[in-house]
Amino acid sequence: MNEYINLDEKNINEEHICCAIGDPKHQAGVDKKKEWIKNKFKDGHVFRKLNARGKIFIEYEPIETAWVPINGKNYEYIYCLWVAGSFKGKGIARELLEYAIKDAKDKKMSGICTLVAQKKKPFLGEKKFFEHFGFKVVDSIKDYELMALQFDDKDTPKFSDSARNMKIDDKDFTIYYTNECPYVEYEVNELSEYAKKKDIKLKFVKIDSLEKAKNAPCIINNWANFYNGEFISNTILNANAFEKLVKWKN
């Protein structure tokens, strides 16, 4: 039987958070992620992981306090469900999701939801996997979709009106981000240095509050790229990827 651990205020300092394990360059991001989680425990934030060294976890919380531009009532929102490497194909993802579903039902929630895409995108769940458990598409913006598993006939969550814009006024390269992902902090610093070195106009907009998250101008789980005012992707970029993007756009 697999052994799982739920992070809480007592164990979070000692436990790893699955991503960026043992990589010193991401330690600042890990620290910020842990602080972010600590501040979310009061909202009912759940981080459940396999008791092993690897990326094997699910993370979710009530939609009312989830840092995403999605509005709803009495639903859980899954930020991330990730099972990587040699742990794939062993039923662990199923066990993690089934735990979250049961947890939501035990809390008398109306359902549970998550963000996917019509075609697989980095840092988003796989649509087919959630379909297997009965999740259905309840809203969409371009090729991004909100899937929900309903427990009753009450209203399902929807993307906020602001997210439907998928545009901003600024024409320079602009990146919106949160500290929900431990990889983000290093890439923000790396891209800042790269843009300065190459004399490229690059702006960062940090989403550091629930209000900012709910009113984000696009689909975002933890990162969003804009150029010429248009949303490009949700992919977290390093310097090499950003360089290719700049060349492609120019």
Predicted features, each with a name:
Residues 83, 89-104:
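Conserved acetyl-CoA-binding loop-helix of GNAT-fold acetyltransferases
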Residues 104-120:
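Conserved GNAT acetyl-CoA-binding A-motif
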Residues 228-250:
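Non-catalytic, surface beta->alpha helical segment in thiol-disulfide oxidoreductase systems
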Residues 115, 131-148, 232:
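Conserved catalytic-core motifs of GNAT/GCN5-like acyltransferases
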Residues 1-51, 161-162, 181-183, 187-190, ...:
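Short amphipathic alpha-helix that is part of the acyltransferase structural core
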Residues 142-165:
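C-terminal "cap" of GNAT-fold acetyltransferases
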